[in-house]
Amino acid sequence: TPTATTFKKIEWNTDVDTFHKSSRDNGTTFARVEDGQWDPKNPNVFYFVTTESNKDPIATAPNPATPDVTRDGGALWRLTFKDAQNPLLGANLEMLLNGGESIMMSKPDNITVTNNGVVVIQEDPGGNAHVARVIAYRISDGKLATLAKFDSQYFTATGSKYMTIDEESSGVIDVTSLLAKPGDTNTYLMLNAQIHVKGGVTKADPAVTGALTARRPDLRNMPSSSKKRIDIEAIE
């Protein structure tokens, strides 16, 4: 059911504490808003995913096929603005997927919306025994399907060519206009695969130690040991 939603202007060019207070006082809290995309056929419609659900029992119910693997199906949302060029006029917010659908989505991460009306969703299970997939949600009727899946021989601990259980795809875009030939009705997507395998780095380069975390004010309260790990493991 669409829910009427209002927007307020938040001053972003300020210090972190002021920004956080303003956001808390005027905003709505979601569990990890991760990525969003405008509908190319409707400039007033915006789709986005939340990677987690704040431990919602529906979204975190185990996949019957892999009952021992933890899961969070997050959610897919749609914002329909009265006028996207003037968001202060308001919008309607809808939850399209609640994470409990039979496809048993796990950690929806990045998305795109194709010209033929499909939301493409990439999973990032995050160091989890679930093998990551690329999922399609057809806007017209809500049908779900798996478009692609990582090869289990590389990404399950018992696989014959095991590398890691920390794999994801990211950055999906619709490149049909670049690749399709006249008369071709296929949809073409481009994405990358992120295989999180350490490259043998055991310590951070002194020249860049702290350079990453120092530029992330949201990490300033992180323990020093965690900051060191980020500096080391940023190279994969």
Language model: regions and residue ranges:
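Sequence/structural signature of beta-propeller domains
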Residues: 1-236
